[in-house]
Amino acid sequence: MSGRLPFSQSFWEEFLMGREGHLPVLPELSHVSKGVIRILGGNPGSMHLQGTNTYLVGTGRSRILIDTAQGLPAWINRISSFLSTQKIELSYVLLTHWHGDHTGGVPDLIARNSSLANKIYKNQPDSGQSPITHGQIFSVDGATVRAILTPGHSVDHMCFLLEEENALFTGDNVLGHGFSVAQDLGRYMDSLRDMASLGCRIGYPAHGAMIENLPGKLEEYIQHREGRERMMLSALTRHRVRGEGTRDERVKYGLTLNEIVLAVYGRLPQEVIEKALAPSLLQVLWKLTEDRMVGFKPGDPLKRQWFALEQRQRNKVRGCRG
């Protein structure tokens, strides 16, 4: 492998592509399978791709709704009209996680139908909501949905397995285009592996098109993250061995985040670094710190120097956030 990752191979290419409007067009409402209807949230943008996907699941009069989008009029008007004309009732409203582009439509749903107030389910629920536990089953005609705890993108993140299709509603853990972000990278990686172990064939993401080869997409996500860890650790290790003297003296040869970007990827536009790279790479550095592979020199966060730990140090040094 070369010492640097080519610009075109990394996730920010799709990040920028999405901002430029090159994503495939998705219908506002579409039957993506016999038992799944996707309704867009009406909130397209660089962070939401074509908008938040919400899903009606089931084949009978009673259905399950997964996520409620951002709370824009376009979504509540669209789903209310569809439910009314098709004479469909909601038995459960399942929320993948707490982020506003997934929970924002809850008040509108309740305002349209007050009986839904006691049908809202979320892991670590807000006041008035019901809890979701790992393995919990939600059933309606044509759909048996099992809750899967998958934290990392957020602390409360849930995926939902549709047993009739061997399909997984992936929430924000895996997107239809590009790569997601993680609040806790270590737990996120564990969740990706847990998702892969389920053996689901297809994925219904919270943003982007249906994933027709979910095992392949999950492998791509895992390899992408692990590859970045290896590249960053390699860059820090190469830099460390150039130092001489005691350990304290070698710490002076650490790299700042911008220097790591330069070492791994070469020169990039500052906008790409700040908006698409820095948050993700900092997550990698903290994970490597927690894994006792990397340490850092305390100080100004913007100028903080990171360094690879030698093997003998890894059993003695614990990284701590500061």
UniProtKB/Swiss-Prot annotation:
Pathway: Secondary metabolite biosynthesis. The gene is nscB. Its EC number is 3.1.-.-. Lactamase-like protein; part of the gene cluster that mediates the biosynthesis of neosartoricin B, a prenylated anthracenone that probably exhibits T-cell antiproliferative activity, suggestive of a physiological role as an immunosuppressive agent. The non-reducing polyketide synthase nscA probably synthesizes and cyclizes the decaketide backbone. The hydrolase nscB then mediates the product release through hydrolysis followed by spontaneous decarboxylation. The prenyltransferase nscD catalyzes the addition of the dimethylallyl group to the aromatic C5. Its cofactor is Zn(2+). This is Lactamase-like protein nscB. It comes from Trichophyton rubrum (strain ATCC MYA-4607 / CBS 118892) (Athlete's foot fungus). Zn(2+) 2 binds at residues 101-102. Pfam families: Lactamase_B. GO terms for biological process: antibiotic catabolic process; secondary metabolite biosynthetic process. GO terms for molecular function: beta-lactamase activity; zinc ion binding. The keyword Manganese does not apply. The lineage of its organism: Eukaryota, Fungi, Dikarya, Ascomycota, Pezizomycotina. It comes from the Eukaryota. Zn(2+) 1 binds at residues 97, 99. Binds 2 Zn(2+) ions per subunit. Keywords: Hydrolase, Metal-binding, Zinc. The active site is at 101 (proton donor/acceptor). InterPro entries: Beta-lactamase_class-B_CS, LACTB2-like_MBL-fold, Metallo-B-lactamas, RibonucZ/Hydroxyglut_hydro, Sec-metab_biosynth-thioest, WH-like_DNA-bd_sf. Gene3D superfamilies: Ribonuclease Z/Hydroxyacylglutathione hydrolase-like (3.60.15.10), Winged helix-like DNA-binding domain superfamily/Winged helix DNA-binding domain (1.10.10.10). It is an enzyme of class 3 (hydrolase). Belongs to the metallo-beta-lactamase superfamily.
